């Protein structure tokens, strides 16, 4: 909305490849960008990837080395971008903020597609898995003129309450094994936190 785009919320599409292909064929002609929520994984009822391939779409990536958000896809059909978000609510929100918002900005204007990040001081300790980037829901606060970040809520891609009260994402690079209190870390504030 803030970019001047007009979103259209489609009803839930049945987990049926024929129905999905029929609906996607119509949507591709009508809209400048398609965003799916769920169906991007590799279960028996996840058909989006195979339908896109069947429609001669180009799969740009499918699955990411991030947490949450591993089952995230990006494709295009007839030059229309198709984002396929994970089904878990927190993973979907994280991927939307990291990838889809950048895609929308790029479609509207090639300027400023990079994420806005600030460096803050960690007020927590966290073990991390090497080899994947991790995004924790976080909360900024100020103490004695210093900006700190704390983990907000419980971890997990399905724990929606971790977004409640969070005002950004704590970014942990794939080569970090542990975050200690006092470490300098990257924080990606939600836009509304900057207002």
What are these regions (language model features)?
Residues 1-36:
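Phosphate-binding glycine-rich loops and their immediate beta-loop-alpha structural context
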Residues 17-18, 42, 93:
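Loop/helix-junction capping segments adjacent to catalytic residues or to phosphate/diphosphate-binding pockets
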Residues 14-17, 38, 89, 153:
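Short loop or secondary-structure boundary microenvironments that flank
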Residues 20-22, 46-48, 76:
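Short acidic, glycine/serine/threonine-rich loops at helix termini
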Residues 51-195:
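Flexible glycine/proline-rich
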Residues 12-15, 39-40, 64-71:
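Short, ordered loop/turn segments at secondary-structure junctions
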Residues 10-13, 38, 85, 172:
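Active-site-adjacent beta-strand anchor residues
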Residues 34-48:
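Glycine-rich beta-strand-to-loop/alpha-helix junction loops that act as flexible
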């Amino acid at each position: 909305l803030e970019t001047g785009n007009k979103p259209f919320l489609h009803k839930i599409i049945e987990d049926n490849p024929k129905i999905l292909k029929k609906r996607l064929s119509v949507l591709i002609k009508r809209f400048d960008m398609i965003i799916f929520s769920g169906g991007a994984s590799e279960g028996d009822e996840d058909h989006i990837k195979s339908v896109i391939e069947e429609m001669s779409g180009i799969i740009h990536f499918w699955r990411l080395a991030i947490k949450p958000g591993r089952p995230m896809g990006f494709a295009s059909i007839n030059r229309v971008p198709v984002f396929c978000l994970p089904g878990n609510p927190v993973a979907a929100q994280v991927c939307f903020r990291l990838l889809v918002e950048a895609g929308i900005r790029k479609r509207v204007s090639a300027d400023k597609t990079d994420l806005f990040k600030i460096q803050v001081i960690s007020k927590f300790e966290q073990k991390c898995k090497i080899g994947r980037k991790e995004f924790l829901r976080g909360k900024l606060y100020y103490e004695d003129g210093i900006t700190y970040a704390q983990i907000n809520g419980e971890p997990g891609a399905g724990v929606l309450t971790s977004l409640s009260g969070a005002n950004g994402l704590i970014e942990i690079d794939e080569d970090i094994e542990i975050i200690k209190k006092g470490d300098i870390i990257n924080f990606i504030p939600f836009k509304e936190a900057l207002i």
